[in-house]
């Protein structure tokens, strides 16, 4: 679920949840920073500001036998510039929040396998775009803007290891001497887990509150409830906060995108040109619940049920938490980093509101939540009824989606008469999907099938499975479709556990390009009720070098330890199928417009292949390589 689209939806749909930062009424005691949300823009700023440093950095990194690859105390001018700007921005953010109890910096460590699949797709897509841009500049004999392989911002690389050491040994000790905050902590890239999930693991462990212990005001209360502030740009932070009973505000840069004049005017009044904003999660929780309660009341005015109280303060706390968990679970259906969205689902107000109304209609009849807040397990009776309802409305979702997709055209298109030829070609690359769809008969024919509406319901399903799963005959592949459905259902269970209690199954991932159709999912649940959701023991995280081998395309092999890089390059005849050339990728352009929306079709990489590579090269790792591959824990800065 992309944060720009989701955040835009929230800002348009709910008033009173955004505040200027700093804010006199908000006094967080605990401040947590999802550091990758700072590192990436800092690196981009330094690339644009210091082009000579970038050139030098690329030269130093390419000398694989040089000091850069063996001396962990050697820092380039580019790295020093990044450290300086990173420190400046951290000082600004800490100065806004002024925490008194906890300052916690979390950097993305080794991710669960499900996240690695998404990272791999994203890195291949970036490699494809980078190569195409280089081709365009060569064609017009133009000097390209400075570039640097930002895949280096991955656990296990030299760059990120040294950046973590800078924070540990230089920045945070200085901050410790100058600050009155009680506890300063660093959760670096060698500690497993995504940054935002590590933050919430810490909150759950050190600030436990029952889901029935709710507080609807994000301020410091007389009872001593601590207010937690988290800096970050990821939509995951919103979902994680909704599943946590603590009082939380999110800090982020003020957004600059709203679809309508009315939205822009309202947000401008609320924020008055501030650079940073607070997102009040407790207020957002209230708006979600108020919206649901209003729909329940309107749809069943004569009902004397206890789920329609006179105010939020009298709402059954268990019901409140259950409604919020269900809301998060519903958002998974729009897709996230771990599961693709259902065909016909996209984050826009009409679709989200339609699903909420359907959910309310089911809940007021069944009084069952999708998720049991005590166990974190899905209630398959409620889930079955839900997918039956979605299946009954599947064609309307698809029709609305296709209609909206056909209206979409590139903004600021390449036909601008003031554009130079190179600008027009770069713009055409940005709108890669739109132009490829227009000029590829096979794709145009496929899209026409989806435009036929309910009269071609079976044809639409056949076309969908052929495009995303390579299935020519659904009748001959019922067993495969059953496997797809069961994988997806387990993925929903995995997701809610990941957001509520943390990740137990590090190895699970969804191995397909698309979600099953609602018809097949509904029929599968009905035929095999209850669907078995396997219990798994806690599975340990992968190591940093394993993640590098999972997520890096061959164009970024320079970031690997020398022994591994040499082995891979010598054996590309064998490993090449798992590491395809980024210049020759096919993309999913169906009903897409922009390149950033398209996922490349790349082969899945078995963990056995990764383990084989590591086993064959482990004797060639030097001391620096070994340090980069070690697992760490949260470090307290004394």
Describe each PLM feature range.
Residues 1-638:
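Noncatalytic, typically N-terminal accessory segments of nucleic acid-processing enzymes
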């Amino acid at each position: 679920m992309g944060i720009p689209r989701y955040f835009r939806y929230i800002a348009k749909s709910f008033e009173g949840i955004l505040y200027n930062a700093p804010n006199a009424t908000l006094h967080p005691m605990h401040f947590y920073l999802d550091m990758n949300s700072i590192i990436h823009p800092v690196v981009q700023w330094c690339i644009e500001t210091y082009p000579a440093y970038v050139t030098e950095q690329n030269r130093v990194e390419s000398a694989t036998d040089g000091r850069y690859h063996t001396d962990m105390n050697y820092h380039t001018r580019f790295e020093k510039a990044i450290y300086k700007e990173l420190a400046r921005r951290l000082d600004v953010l800490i100065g806004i929040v002024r925490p008194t109890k906890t300052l916690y910096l979390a950097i993305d460590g080794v991710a669960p396998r499900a996240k690695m699949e998404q990272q791999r797709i994203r890195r291949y897509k970036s490699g494809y775009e980078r190569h195409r841009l280089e081709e365009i500049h060569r064609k017009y004999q133009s000097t390209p803007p400075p570039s640097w392989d930002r895949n280096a911002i991955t656990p296990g690389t030299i760059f990120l290891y040294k950046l973590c050491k800078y924070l540990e040994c230089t920045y945070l000790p200085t901050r410790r001497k100058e600050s009155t905050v009680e506890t300063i902590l660093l959760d670096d890239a060698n500690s497993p887990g995504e940054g935002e999930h590590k933050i919430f693991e810490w909150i759950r462990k050190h600030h436990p509150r029952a889901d029935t212990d709710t507080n609807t005001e994000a301020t410091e209360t007389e009872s001593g409830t601590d207010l937690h502030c988290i800096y970050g740009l990821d939509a995951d932070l919103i979902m994680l906060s909704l599943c946590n009973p603590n009082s939380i505000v999110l800090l982020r840069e003020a957004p600059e995108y709203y679809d309508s004049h009315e939205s822009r005017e309202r947000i401008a009044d609320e924020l008055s040109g501030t650079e940073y904003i607070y997102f009040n999660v407790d207020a957002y929780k209230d708006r979600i619940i108020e919206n649901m309660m209003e729909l329940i009341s309107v749809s069943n005015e004569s009902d004397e049920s206890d789920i329609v109280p006179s105010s939020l303060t009298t709402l059954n706390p268990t019901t409140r938490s259950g409604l919020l968990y269900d809301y998060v679970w519903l958002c998974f259906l729009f897709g996230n980093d771990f599961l693709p969205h259902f065909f016909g689902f996209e984050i826009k107000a009409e679709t989200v509101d339609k699903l909420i109304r359907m959910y309310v209609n089911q809940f007021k009849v069944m009084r069952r939540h999708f998720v049991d807040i005590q166990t974190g397990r899905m209630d398959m009776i409620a889930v079955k009824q839900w997918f039956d309802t979605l299946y009954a409305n599947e064609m309307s979702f698809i029709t609305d989606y296709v209609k909206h997709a056909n209206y979409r055209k590139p903004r600021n298109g390449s036909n601008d008469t003031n554009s130079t030829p190179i600008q027009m070609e770069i713009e055409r690359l940005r709108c890669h999907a739109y132009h490829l769809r227009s000029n590829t008969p096979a794709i145009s024919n496929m899209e026409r099938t989806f435009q036929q509406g309910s009269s071609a319901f079976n044809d639409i399903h056949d076309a969908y499975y052929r495009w995303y799963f390579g299935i020519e005959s659904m009748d001959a592949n019922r067993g495969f479709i059953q496997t797809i459905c069961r994988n997806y259902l387990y993925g929903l269970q995995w997701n809610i556990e990941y957001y509520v209690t943390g990740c137990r199954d590090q190895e699970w991932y969804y191995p397909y390009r698309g979600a099953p159709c609602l018809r097949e999912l509904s029929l599968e649940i009905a035929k095999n009720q209850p669907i078995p959701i396997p219990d798994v023991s806690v599975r340990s995280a992968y190591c940093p070098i394993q993640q590098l081998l999972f997520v890096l395309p061959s164009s970024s092999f320079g970031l690997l330890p020398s022994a591994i890089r040499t082995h891979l390059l010598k054996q590309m005849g064998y490993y090449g199928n798992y590491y395809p050339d980024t210049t020759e990728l096919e993309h999913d352009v169906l009903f897409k417009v922009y390149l950033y929306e398209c996922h490349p079709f790349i082969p899945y990489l078995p963990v056995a292949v990764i383990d084989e590579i590591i086993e064959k090269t482990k004797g060639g790792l030097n001391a620096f390589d070994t340090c980069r591959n070690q697992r760490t824990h949260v470090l307290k800065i004394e």
